[in-house]
């Protein structure tokens, strides 16, 4: 099955599973998706993820994170740069998500990173998504 926007599909699966209070969600794997999952884990939005290698593509099982009263750690996750309209930002125009309460994930020449790290390293890139 071919997707127009595989990253958007991953983010939608995470958003839907989180709002339905599921423990895990399964996503088809790619190197970019694995790196996005690593960033989400480092920033504390998901508990963990497991990469399943099975033949050509594989899959990622993402373990979602909730508070003690079952509120999801991810309030919202939005795709910014889409296949039909790519959004690139320079270092000085990287947005602050909810005044620093959320994160923006960028794909830069130095890899996939959060907005704080991109500002620190003074690199811009493609604004993949925002999470809060």
Swiss-Prot record:
Ranges annotated as spanning the membrane? none
UniProtKB keywords? Ribonucleoprotein, Ribosomal protein, RNA-binding, rRNA-binding
* Annotated InterPro entries: Ribosomal_uS8, Ribosomal_uS8_CS, Ribosomal_uS8_sf
* GO CC terms of this entry: ribonucleoprotein complex; ribosome
Which domain of life does this protein belong to?
Bacteria
Q: Which GO terms describe its biological process?
A: translation
How would you summarize the oligomeric state and partners of this protein? Part of the 30S ribosomal subunit. Contacts proteins S5 and S12.
Under the heading HAMAP family, the entry gives:
Ribosomal_uS8_B
Q: Which family does it belong to?
A: Belongs to the universal ribosomal protein uS8 family.
- Protein's recorded name: Small ribosomal subunit protein uS8
The organism named in the record is Anaeromyxobacter dehalogenans (strain 2CP-C)
């Amino acid at each position: 099955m071919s997707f127009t926007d595989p990253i958007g599909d991953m983010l939608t699966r995470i958003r839907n599973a989180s709002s339905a209070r599921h423990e895990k969600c399964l996503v088809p794997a790619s190197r970019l998706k694995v790196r996005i999952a690593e960033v989400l884990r480092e920033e504390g939005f998901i508990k963990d993820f497991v990469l399943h290698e099975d033949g050509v593509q594989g899959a990622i099982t993402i373990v979602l994170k909730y508070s003690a009263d079952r509120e999801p750690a991810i309030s919202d996750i939005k795709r910014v740069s889409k296949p039909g309209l790519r959004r690139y930002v320079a270092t000085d125009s990287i947005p602050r998500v909810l005044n620093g309460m959320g994160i923006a994930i960028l794909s830069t020449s130095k890899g996939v990173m959060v907005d704080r790290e991109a500002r620190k390293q003074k690199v811009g890139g493609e604004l993949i998504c925002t999470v809060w």
